Structure formats: C-alpha cells, structure tokens
Amino acid sequence: MKFKTLIFSLSISFFAGLMYQCQVSKNSRANPSKEVQQLVDYMVGDFSSQAQSVRDSDFYDIRLHIRPIWKNDASNHWLYVEQATAAAEHKPYRQRVYKVEKEASGGVKSIVYTLPDPEKWAGKYKTPEAFDQLKPSELSLREGCTVFLKKQKDGSFIGATQGTDCESTLRGAKYASSIVTVTATELRSWDQGFDEKGAQVWGATKGGYEFVKIK
C-alpha cells in the first residue's frame, strides 16, 4: 500500500512538473511575440530631430515617418519607413521596408528591405494601403543589415547590426552599421559608414540622431 502511495505521489509530482514546464515553455514563446508588438507600437508614427538640430548644428532637422503595411498578413509585421530633411520632405533620401519579428535567442529583429522604384512610393506613408499593390516578394533584402534588439528593464529596446556585412558604397564606404534605441516617445539611430580599413567615412561622429515622436 505504501509502495502504491509512493508511486501515486511520484506520478502527481511528475505530471505537475511537466505541466509547469509546458507553461514556462508556452510563456517563453509568448513573451517575444508581445515584445514584437510593443516594439512595432513604439516605432509607428511621425518623428522629428528638430530639437536636436537646434541644440547642435552638426545635426540636420530630419523627419522620419513609419507606417504599418500589409496588415492582412496576420503572421508578420511589416513597416514602411521614409526619411527626409524637413526642408524637402517630398524628396526622401531613404526609403525602406522593415519586417519585425522575434529572434531565436529571445530578442526581436528588424529585417531591412529596399523597394523597387522607390520614387513611386515617396510620400505613401500618408496612404499606406497603396502598398497593397506591392508584394513582399518584390522587395530586395539588405543582407547583413538586420538590427537585433533586446528589451531593457526600463522598457526600451536597444540593438544594432552585427558584423561588417551591411554593404554601403556611399563616399567610398565598404560597410555600414546601425545602433538603435527605441522607446515609447523617441527613436535614436546612429548610422555610420566605414571603409575597408575601418575608418568612418559618413554618418554622425558624436552620436545618433534623436527622433522625437510628434504624432
């Protein structure tokens, strides 16, 4: 009888432990998804570096617009990103599409793509449904330019590109790097280009641009 009681107790302990492990596993899978949504919510909006440009003339007054696109794709988060000087918002100098998803290590990654015929999409952050005419398969992946981010204790996300595989030819550069911090009210981005010897040839030297969310 004592032997049966022992077996029963062990069985209860085993199944309780198994159920706990399943719950932990379930939670560990769910948390990254919540972090992805939180990061996307932080990123979507209109941003300005005007305040920084007033404080420091080494920085330009830049406008950054980020909008969700392809909302019918329930399994992925796609963002259209447009960047232009405040003096020429109708002529963006950078247009990208980001695919934001959970990363295998538990963080979040933002995969970077370029658009075909980017001029056609200039200003389309105002009407993001226009991207329904475009398919994800028509985008071009920016190899090595993915930004890997981790959520911090204060709720912000901090991350960067990895290695030297994000190709750039601007001003004699060989590769580019990005260091990013995202909060509910601000997006900081430090983009730099380096030549084959590792010397910086473009980008801010003091630190990143500080984009304050204005809408």
Feature map (PLM): residue ranges:
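Short, solvent-exposed loop/hinge segments that bridge or flank secondary-structure elements
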Residues: P32, V36-Q38, S49-A74
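Short, charged, low-hydrophobicity "junction" segments
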Residues: Y20-V24, V54, A160-T164
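Calycin-type beta-barrel ligand-binding domains and close structural analogs
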Residues: P32-D46, Q50, A87-K215
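Bacterial Sec-dependent N-terminal signal peptides
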Residues: M1-A30
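A generic structural signal for short, non-catalytic loop/turn and secondary-structure boundary residues
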Residues: I12-F15, A74, V182, A204
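Residues at beta-strand starts and edge strands
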Residues: Y60, S75-H77, G106, T185
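N-terminal glycine/threonine-rich, aromatic-flanked beta-hairpin/loop signature
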Residues: L64-Y93
